[in-house]
Amino acid sequence: MSAIAPGMILFAYLCGSISSAILVCRIAGLPDPRESGSGNPGATNVLRIGGKGAAVAVLIFDILKGMLPVWGAYALGVTPFWLGLIAIAACLGHIWPVFFGFKGGKGVATAFGAIAPIGWDLTGVMAGTWLLTVLLSGYSSLGAIVSALIAPFYVWWFKPQFTFPVSMLSCLILLRHHDNIQRLWRRQETKIWTKLKKKRQKDSE
């Protein structure tokens, strides 16, 4: 079944290239997320500029565009190595979307969706790690960074044959969060609650 893998890689990249943040903002009449808030076309920034409804729509779509190509390839018996490349292709599409001038998001939700087909137990642990980190720290970026660092160890525990491809995916996410890591180190990163509070104050004026 690995013969179909190259085609699945292309399909995954094209799926990832559909920027739901930009499309949802256009449909909802919201500012372009690439030019507003943090400038990142992802669910967290849409939450800041458009509220919960728009952000949830973006989050679900971003998860699905990582999940569906990998799940399809997994069902067809594609080997773990190729599954890893398919997952990375979906994230690359999200980060550098061919349909939107190669300016995309950071790939966290798409990566989460790509990992989900490995198992619901792993999915639950990953989601719990991200949520707990965000609740304790207030930093969405830190939640993504911690989850990416721990993901290979979780996968090794649940299904070790997928450790290498998930490690590749984690490296991509960490590289994409390079600027966030620097801001966290310098204590210059803004907490998500602070930005939401500012938005509410602005809306009430």
UniProtKB/Swiss-Prot annotation:
Substrates-to-products reaction catalysed: sn-glycerol 3-phosphate + an acyl-CoA = a 1-acyl-sn-glycero-3-phosphate + CoA; a fatty acyl-[ACP] + sn-glycerol 3-phosphate = a 1-acyl-sn-glycero-3-phosphate + holo-[ACP]
Periplasmic domain ranges by topology: 1-3, 74-80, 133-137
Membrane topology recorded in Swiss-Prot or TrEMBL: Multi-pass membrane protein
Regions crossing the membrane: 4-24, 53-73, 81-101, 112-132, 138-158
GO cellular component, one term: plasma membrane
Subcellular location: Cell inner membrane
GO MF annotations, alphabetized: acyl-phosphate glycerol-3-phosphate acyltransferase activity; glycerol-3-phosphate O-acyltransferase activity
Chief site of localization: membrane
Key word Cell membrane present: yes
Enzyme class, first EC level, given as a word: transferase
Keywords, ordered alphabetically: Cell inner membrane, Cell membrane, Lipid biosynthesis, Lipid metabolism, Membrane, Phospholipid biosynthesis, Phospholipid metabolism, Transferase, Transmembrane, Transmembrane helix
Gene Ontology biological process terms in this record: phospholipid biosynthetic process
Biological pathway: Lipid metabolism; phospholipid metabolism
InterPro entries noted in UniProt: G3P_acylTferase_PlsY (IPR003811)
Disulfide links within the chain: none
EC number: 2.3.1.15, 2.3.1.n5
Pfam families, per database record: G3P_acyltransf
Residue intervals on the Cytoplasmic side: 25-52, 102-111, 159-205
Stored HAMAP family: PlsY
Subunit and interaction comment: Probably interacts with PlsX.
Family: Belongs to the PlsY family.
Free-text function comment from the UniProt entry: Catalyzes the transfer of an acyl group from acyl-ACP to glycerol-3-phosphate (G3P) to form lysophosphatidic acid (LPA). This enzyme can also utilize acyl-CoA as fatty acyl donor, but not acyl-PO(4).
Protein name: Glycerol-3-phosphate acyltransferase
Organism: Salmonella schwarzengrund (strain CVM19633)
